[in-house]
Amino acid sequence: MVDSTLIKDSTDTSVAEPVIKPHLILALDYGVKKMGMALGNSLTETARAFDILAMNNGQPDWDNLLGIIKVWGVAKVVVGLPLNMDGSSSMLSKRAHKFARRLAHRIMEQHLPVIVSLCDERLTSVAAREIAWENGWIKHERAPIDDISACILMSTYFADPHSSIAIDAIKAD
């Protein structure tokens, strides 16, 4: 005997709820000398420090970065935008924006289904250093905290994902 509650009525025109598929997000704390990385899970809205990449005057090892995106199956990259406290652009924020455009362009060239966006990262480094000190993760003032900053950037993104700005790869330099 078949349970009639399991049979869909052909006159039922309701649309099923869309299934939200969890995906990985890569947060990048952009810098001229180094770039912090964190991986976030869209379902649990949690992030983990991942790595710190060496930068050559603001340029990463593109093959390495794109390889990380491919291997981990990243669906979105969030690049930190270091604005001034009054919200105006800084020299570094202009470079971060240019980096994000270049990244989007390279991702497009690789035919990867990855979205690149920018997210305000004001005070992430200050918060990261404070958290690292409190937890004993660093022992001296100059210890690298870029990956922790990327985690905080990811938390900022999860708190308000609609505040990020999507990057158009067509405008890449």
Swiss-Prot record:
UniProt subcellular location: Cytoplasm
Gene Ontology molecular function: any one: nuclease activity
Family as reported in the entry's similarity comment: Belongs to the YqgF nuclease family.
Coiled coil regions, renumbered to chain: none
Entry protein name: Putative pre-16S rRNA nuclease
InterPro entries: RNaseH-like_sf (IPR012337), YqgF (IPR005227), YqgF/RNaseH-like_dom (IPR006641), YqgF/RNaseH-like_dom_sf (IPR037027)
HAMAP family to which the protein is assigned, alphabetical: Nuclease_YqgF
Gene Ontology BP annotations: rRNA 5'-end processing
Keyword field: Cytoplasm, Hydrolase, Nuclease, Ribosome biogenesis
Main location: cytoplasm
Keyword Cytoplasm appears in the UniProt entry: yes
Cited function: Could be a nuclease involved in processing of the 5'-end of pre-16S rRNA.
E.C. number: 3.1.-.-
Entry GO CC: cytosol
